[in-house]
């Protein structure tokens, strides 16, 4: 994705850039798919009601109004939420901790763990492989969509990870000799098992986080702080139930 060239040389928007939108609705970026479904009850408790088709997978719209005239929702791929927020396309968003670990955007502040979408980033290898291919090795071929996380993890074991960057069908990589192991997001593990793989290590446990653009928080502090508190209250309501 090519970042918009606004305000700074690296494409990140400055306070002056975001101030242009200061009278416009705040933009909340939400991920498509299972996280959006899990998020729906949280949104209800915050009092945020997006247009009905926002929660419909078949809808081709990407931007939606809400019950709050000062808040619009955009629906994007889960891996892209952090990019939209970091580059100022959205003021606030919901994304997995895996995305924050992978990209580590300095312009993102993550004030709340929403506790939904629980899963884990794991290393997996074929069940037929008796020994861990990483044992005693200084180099290892890894298929993943998380190159930063994978390199960091194996570097901690003094292993140089050679990355095969895939965005899907990760489980095929070891069986087709593209890689010795994979690093992927795992929920139940059923897809791994169905493809003859087994988990060997858990790198990190992952839940969804509320994230905020730091510049937007400075330029529209009252609005964004109020929105954060609505999410915080919604989580407290759930815990008290």
Swiss-Prot record:
CDD domains the record matches: PBP2_HisGs
A molecular-function term among this protein's GO annotations: ATP phosphoribosyltransferase activity
Organism superkingdom: Bacteria
One GO BP annotation of this record: L-histidine biosynthetic process
Matches recorded under SUPFAM superfamilies: Periplasmic binding protein-like II (SSF53850)
InterPro entries reported in the protein's UniProt record: ATP_PRibTrfase_cat (IPR013820), ATP_PRibTrfase_CS (IPR018198), ATP_PRibTrfase_HisG (IPR001348), ATP_PRibTrfase_HisG_short (IPR024893)
Keywords linked to the UniProt accession: Amino-acid biosynthesis, ATP-binding, Cytoplasm, Glycosyltransferase, Histidine biosynthesis, Nucleotide-binding, Transferase
Pathway assigned to this chain's UniProt record: Amino-acid biosynthesis; L-histidine biosynthesis; L-histidine from 5-phospho-alpha-D-ribose 1-diphosphate: step 1/9
One GO cellular component, as annotated: cytoplasm
Catalysed reaction, written as an equation: 1-(5-phospho-beta-D-ribosyl)-ATP + diphosphate = 5-phospho-alpha-D-ribose 1-diphosphate + ATP
EC number: 2.4.2.17
Enzyme class: transferase
Subcellular location(s) of the protein: Cytoplasm
Domain notes: Lacks the C-terminal regulatory region which is replaced by HisZ.
Subunit field text: Heteromultimer composed of HisG and HisZ subunits.
Functional note: Catalyzes the condensation of ATP and 5-phosphoribose 1-diphosphate to form N'-(5'-phosphoribosyl)-ATP (PR-ATP). Has a crucial role in the pathway because the rate of histidine biosynthesis seems to be controlled primarily by regulation of HisG enzymatic activity.
Record-stated family: Belongs to the ATP phosphoribosyltransferase family. Short subfamily.
Protein name in UniProt: ATP phosphoribosyltransferase
Organism annotation: Gluconobacter oxydans (strain 621H)
């Amino acid at each position: 994705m090519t970042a918009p060239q606004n305000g700074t040389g690296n494409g990140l928007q400055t306070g002056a850039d975001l101030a242009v939108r200061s009278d416009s609705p705040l933009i909340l970026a939400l991920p498509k798919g299972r996280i959006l479904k899990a998020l729906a009850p949280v949104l209800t408790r915050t009092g945020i009601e997006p247009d009905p088709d926002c929660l419909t997978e078949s809808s081709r719209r990407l931007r939606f109004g809400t019950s709050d005239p000062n808040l619009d929702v955009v629906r994007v791929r889960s891996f892209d939420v952090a990019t939209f927020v970091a580059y100022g396309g959205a003021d606030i968003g919901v994304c997995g901790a895996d995305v924050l670990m992978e990209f580590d955007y300095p312009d993102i502040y993550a004030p709340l763990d929403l506790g939904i979408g629980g899963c884990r980033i794991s290393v997996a290898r074929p069940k037929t492989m008796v020994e861990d291919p990483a044992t005693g090795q200084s180099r290892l071929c890894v298929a993943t969509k998380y190159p930063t996380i994978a390199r960091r993890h194996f570097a901690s074991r003094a292993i140089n990870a050679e990355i095969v960057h895939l965005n899907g069908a990760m489980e095929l990589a070891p069986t087709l000799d593209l890689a010795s192991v994979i690093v992927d997001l795992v929920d139940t593990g059923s897809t791994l098992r169905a493809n003859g793989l087994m988990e060997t290590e858990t790198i990190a446990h992952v839940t969804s986080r509320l994230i905020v653009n730091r510049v937007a928080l400075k330029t529209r502090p009252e609005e964004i702080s109020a929105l954060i508190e609505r999410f915080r209250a919604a989580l407290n309501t759930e815990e008290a139930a």
